[in-house]
Amino acid sequence: MSMLRLQKRLASSVLRCGKKKVWLDPNETNEIANANSHQQIRKLIKDGLIIRKPVTVHSRARCRKNTLARRKGRHMGIGKRKGTANARMPEKVTWMRRMRILRRLLRRYRESKKIDRHMYHSLYLKVKGNVFKNKRILMEHIHKLKADKAHKKLLADQAEARRSKTKEARKRREERLQAKKEEIIKTLSKEEETKK
């Protein structure tokens, strides 16, 4: 059997692949050995004596299966961990995510007129100061603030109504007293006139 190194090299350059991917027909070695140019190699490829081997399968099925399992939390125990907690999930990244979520919520509430700009500003600073652990707590805080505000407004309205009521009552009382005084003065003046 003759060496077919040259033919393999020529075939790999024609097929534009590695020498490992070139298959030479073992039954036609003599014919292949005679070919010593690109043109002849092209003819052999056309005839099917030289073939480019298909790409070897590198399956990702196992990898996909493991990834799905990891999403559920499998294979993630203490024994599988190499880096520190901060290296695995940086504190800065979690902080940025939380800030973006909370600030987005505040912006949405301000745009939909659920909170005014003053409340927005104070809550924005509180968010920055790490007051709220998550979105739910911030929403509860906003609802509580709004409820307190509504309650204060109700109390203020009630107090105002009470004040106006007492004011009106005082005014009526004064009017009654004034009318009584005028009546008494009239009766006294009449009596004096009759005496004369």
Swiss-Prot record:
It comes from the Eukaryota. Keywords: Citrullination, Cytoplasm, Isopeptide bond, Phosphoprotein, Ribonucleoprotein, Ribosomal protein, Ubl conjugation. It is found in: Cytoplasm. The modification Phosphothreonine is found at residue 187. GO terms for cellular component: cytosolic large ribosomal subunit. One of its GO terms (molecular function) is structural constituent of ribosome. The keyword Phosphoprotein applies. Residues 158-181 are annotated as: Disordered. Citrullinated by PADI4. The keyword Signal does not apply. One of its GO terms (biological process) is translation. Residues 159-181 have a biased composition (Basic and acidic residues). Gene3D superfamilies: 1.10.1200.240, 1.10.1650.10. Its main location: cytoplasm. The modification Citrulline is found at residues 5, 16. There is a cross-link at residue 181 (Glycyl lysine isopeptide (Lys-Gly) (interchain with G-Cter in SUMO1)). Disulfide bonds: none annotated. The modification Phosphoserine is found at residues 13, 164. InterPro entries: 60S_ribosomal_eL19_sf, Ribosomal_eL19, Ribosomal_eL19_CS, Ribosomal_eL19_dom, Ribosomal_eL19_dom1, Ribosomal_eL19_euk. Component of the large ribosomal subunit. Belongs to the eukaryotic ribosomal protein eL19 family. HAMAP family: Ribosomal_eL19. Component of the large ribosomal subunit. The ribosome is a large ribonucleoprotein complex responsible for the synthesis of proteins in the cell. This is Large ribosomal subunit protein eL19. It comes from Oryctolagus cuniculus. The gene is RPL19.
